[in-house]
Amino acid sequence: MTLYPKLIEEALATVIYPGTKKNLIESEMLADTPSINGMKVKVVLLFPRDTDPFLKSTVKAAEAAIHYHISKDVEVEIVTEFKSAPRPEVGKMLPQVKNVIAVSSGKGGVGKSTVSANLAIALAKLGYKVGLLDTDIFGPSMPKMFGVEEERPYYVHKDGRDLIEPVEKYGVKLLSIGFFVSPTTATLWRGGMACSALKQLIADADWGELDYFILDTPPGTSDIHLTLLQTLSITGAVIVSTPQQVALADARKGIDMYQNDKVNVPILGLIENMAYFTPAELPENKYYIFGKEGCKNLAKEMNVPLLAQIPIVQSICEGGDDGAPAATKVDSITGQAFLSLAQSVVTVVNRRNAEKAPTKIVSTHK
C-alpha cells in the first residue's frame, strides 16, 4: 500500500475539533504536510494552547481516523504544537476585572443559576460592564437560559495569544462549557480535565474590562470551587438557598467553605429563593411552601445581609426556559425585584471594598 499526504489529510478531515466544531483541516490545525516514510506517518497538529482540554481526545481521534480510513498497519506519530503566547500567571489573571462575585449554593435545585443569570442581566441594566461564567462543567445551563444554545464562541488574536471571544447577549458577556459540548451528551471527565477546561474559560478568553464578573458555581463544595479559589481573587460570595431546612443545612456548609481560614472570601449576603408563593387571583396572600424566613434567620445567625427574598413566580421559570430571563423585562414586578437585588449587591460590594483588602488567592502549596 502506498501512502501519500492527501490520503492522510482526508482521514484527518473526518475528525471534528470540539473547540471550533469544524474538522482538523477546516480548523487549520494541520501545521504542515504530513511526513511519510513507508508505512510511518508523522502529523503535526497545531492547538490554540498547551492547556487545551480537548488535546488528548483530539490526538486519539486523529490516530484512530488514520487507522480506520487507511490501515491499522500505519505507524502514526502525532506531534502537538501551540500557537498562543503563555497565559498570565495565577494572581495576574483578569487584571481588567474589578469585582468577581461567586454565586453559590450548598444544594442543587435551589435556583442558583436562575439567580446568577438574572443578577448578571440586572447589573447590565444598571449600566455596569458584566461577564458571566458558567462554571458548572458537568451541568451547564447558561446557554439554554440565555437562548444562545446554537451560538459558538470564536477565537480572536490579541496580545500574541488566541483568545476565546465570549458570546454576548442582554449586555452580558457569557461563556460556558455548554458551547463546546453536545447538550444531549454527558461530560465524562475526571476532575483534573474539568478544572483545566474551567481555567481555559477564565484565562484564555477575551473578557475585557468588567465591573462585575459573575461566577455561576456548581452546587456543593468541589474541585471546581477550589480551582476558582486558586485562580481568581474573589471579591465575595452570594449564597442562594430555599427556606427549607435541608437546603439551609447545605448552605451553612457553603458559607463555611468561604469562611475557612485558608480561604477567607467575604460572604456578601444570602438570597432566599422560592421564599413564598402568591396566587395571581389572591395577590395579598403568601403561602410559605418550603418554610418561612429560613434564610432570614440564617443570615441573622451568620451576621450577613439578607439580599432578597424571591417568590415562586411562573414567569421566572418560563423566562429561563425560553431564553429570556425575568430581569430582561425591567417593567415587570419580577424584573424590578432583580434590579433591586442588583442594587443591593452593588451596595454590599462597595462597602466590602471600602472596608477590606482584596481577597488573596488560595495557595496551592500545603
What does each of the following model-derived ranges do?
Residues 123, 128-184, 195:
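Phosphate-binding loop that captures ATP/GTP phosphates
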Residues 154-156, 177-192, 199-227:
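Switch II (G3) loop of P-loop NTPases
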Residues 26-29, 36-37, 41-104, 342, ...:
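Extreme N-terminal, non-catalytic leader segments
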Residues 100-136, 263, 270:
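Walker A/P-loop phosphate-binding motif and the immediately C-terminal alpha-helix
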Residues 322-332:
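C-terminal boundary of histidine-terminating zinc-finger modules
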Residues 288-314, 331-336, 340-366:
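C-terminal accessory "lid"/substrate-recognition subdomains
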Residues 59-60, 211-212, 218-318:
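Conserved catalytic-core segment of NTP-binding enzymes
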Residues 1-34:
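N-proximal, solvent-exposed amphipathic alpha-helical segments enriched in charged/polar residues
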